[in-house]
Amino acid sequence: MRKRVFLCILIGWWGMIHAQLLPPIYNYTPSEYKGESQNWKICQAENKKIYFANNTGLLEFNGVVWQRYPLPNGAIARAVSAKGNTLYTGGFAEFGYWQPNKFNELQYTSLSRQLNPADIEDEEIWKIIFSDRWVLFQSLHKIFIYDTQQQRFKIISATHHLPKIFKIGEHIYFQKMKEGLFKLVNGEEVLVTDHPLFREHILINLLPQKEHFLFVTQDKGIYEGTPTQIEAWKVSASQLINTLNIYSCERLSDGSLVLGTIAKGVYRISAKGELLEHLQQKEGLQNNTVLSIFEDKEHNVWLGLDNGISMVNFFSPFRLYKDYEGILGAVYTSIVHQGTLYLGTNQGLFYTPFPLQSNSKFSLVEGTNGQVWQLKVVENTLFCGHNSGTFIIENHQATSICNLLGTWDVKPIAGHSNWLLQGNYEGLHLLEKKDGRWQYRNKIEGFNVSSRFFEFISPTELLVSHEYKGVFRLQLNDDFTKVTQVHKETSAPMGRKSAIAKYRNEIWYFTEKGLFKYNTTTHKFVQDEALTQQLFHQDSYLSGTLVQGKDEGLWAFTQHNIVKIAQGKLDNVPQLKKMPLSASFRKDLVGYENLYEYREGDCLLGTSTGFMSFVFNQVTHTPYEVHIEHIASSRVEGALRAIALDTKEIEFNHTENNFTFSYSVPAYCGMFPSVYQYKLKGLYEHWSDWSEEATVRFENLPAGDYTFLVRAKVGDAVSPNTASFHFVIRKPWYATNVMIAFYIALLCGLLLVVHRVYRVHYKRHKKKVEQEKEKELALMQLENDRTVMQLRNDKLQSEVESKNRELAATTMSIVRKNELLMSIKEALLSSGNGKEVLHIVDDNINSEGDWEHFQEIFNQTDRDFLTRLKNLHPDLTPNDIKLCIYLRLNLSSKEIAPLLNISTQSVEIKRYRLRKKMLLERNQNLTDYILKL
């Protein structure tokens, strides 16, 4: 960031100080512009950037940043000139031109390489001028004329020294030492005059002057006339000019001449030949040797020095005075009275005739050494409020009328023309005029608070403001000897550096809480919201000091502005006019700001280092266009990559998402700082706060569409344009629309697969469930069947048991019957009678009917036995089968015998035979075998 230095002169001794109000001076040191000390030529391109031919090459300044471009051979740049935005430079054995590339950086094209090396050898270019399509490069022995259309050279040589070349209108003039003044006609040199002035003295500049010329020489002063009729320029400054060793000279836009000298700084001479300013190192320049002079488009005058660069704003409405030696001190109050300017400082009261002249001298009013607080004229008498008391100043002499410590202010009392109320460190006091002279009368008892700010509500009622204790309303007795009532005004918020002042018969109170107006009816302070909003809008509170102006205006001081509150022309509503003069430039005495308006709009502002004057109505704010200077991108922790500015839209990889933007406005007057606002659409839509920082960096931007916007403000003038740059950060390949479509398709496919898998799974599950259900049903069915079977078996078992019981009963019946019949038969046999009965008995014993009935029952109970038996033993006889049936019923031989109508022994024999037929082993039981079948 450039360093601004604002300097003024102070030479003298205690009690008398030379006063010279100087224009603002801005100094740039070699360490700031990163070059060497000497600066040989200066120019300005169409884009308003300033360029310097420096020992290290070409310097570029855009109002914010310095950039250095070395010449290809590392030579000193002696000359620079701009045509549009093309810069032509020249140095030792080298000249060519520079043009900005797409990155807004200058690229060099050498023209001297088109020449025969012998033509340029040992030549050093000192000046470059343009004429139609030709560019003329002047060295000390040659002029190289370059045709930009045909790209060809023509060379004019000089036997002797060729110091300068000039363009007057469409004519080209140049000087050859020992030969005279020449003119180019159709590309040929023509001698204009061989006057001794041109043969023997170096011509620094040739300037048109109505129908003749001004000839500025290095060491013979200035002449006027035609080339053939020359005479000295006879003006008031001629004698001074004739003593100067002039190295550079330029005419400014107002017609004045600026002469750069060796060892004596710079002189500004009016068109009439009057000395306007003389600036040298003690006035603030960095060096007294001025190598080059240039007036830019905003009328700032640049000085290329033997050591550094200075910029002087001769046309500024501001003039500065700075007390470097500390003799004058900090200015707390000022006033013009009876043709004299008085300055009250921390070191005394000083005076000088007014208006100020270049040779004005400040003198100390004897006896006023120390802190002066206030200067005020009451009834044409000048009162001086001093740390030592109160003085009346007459004819530059001080007369003490009160020796009480610390007089802040004095005010007239309505209805009492011979009384003045005085505020002191310890309350209020009364001054009285007796026999035409003012004197101290009494202290007003009952109030001992320091009374720096006080205003009358009525002749005996007033308000007193103290920044730490608040605002008090005091009621005085009619004799002004004591305070009868003290009321603390709670409606007035306390605040640092707060103060009250009267404006158009109304009392105003200014604090960091806002601007308040006192209502005499309700005895309340009411905030003026409209004025408070205007005062504090994008501004910072600095001090509540309010100063009465010339036209009943009221001056206030904020962090960034001096504000004038004045009545509206068409209504009674107060209007605010702001002058963007920052506190850092003003060098305010915060809380003790003082501004004296000696004429409407003409102001003198006291500062901590002296004072400044300005014409408020002449302070204008030129709008400047803002430009994006450079754009760089980078990856995380990667190197910066310059971005072309001529690209309407550019896309970046998602990993290249860090961006740095640099911007500027070509405003070089540091009186009003350049501030910037930016926003990045696509990230956020609101503007940033105003800031002097001219670079912004964005890191880790997400993929998206962005537009960077920046605007500037110089003073109160916002740039008419908004510079912009549009760019896109591409999404990573895996987040592109194609990939997103692929992901959607893949997701749909996956969903479809999942759906299908689910359907298959569902079907399988359903089938499994169905199978399990079927199995369960089958099991249930089996269980039911088993139950039914069990029931059926139980029924069958019951039936079998029933049949068995029936069979057993039948068997037993048959057995009993046969036994009975056998008994009967035996009885009959033993009696020998009854053959017929025997026959009946035998028929009943061998009754087939009984057997068939028995067999039917047996088959119902044991259906398969006979089948198995016959299958295993097919050779069994019916009697054998009958025996097997009886054995199946587990009947003994004894029980079987009656059934077969044979003896028990016969049964045993049958059993034996049956065993043999069945091929049973000896140890195998016949009954068990039959039961197991």
Label the predicted regions.
Residues 319-323, 739, 752-822:
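Cytosolic signal-transmission helices at domain junctions
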Residues 332-333, 798, 867:
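PAS-family sensory domains
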Residues 614, 634, 757, 817, ...:
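Phosphate/oxyanion-binding loops and surfaces in catalytic or ligand/nucleic-acid-binding neighborhoods
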Residues 1-730, 736-737, 742-755:
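Carboxylate-rich, polar loop motifs that coordinate divalent cations or form catalytic acidic clusters
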Residues 179, 792-799, 827-836:
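Short, compositionally biased low-complexity segments
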Residues 647-649, 664-730, 821-822, 829, ...:
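Cytosolic nucleotide-binding catalytic cores of signal-transduction proteins
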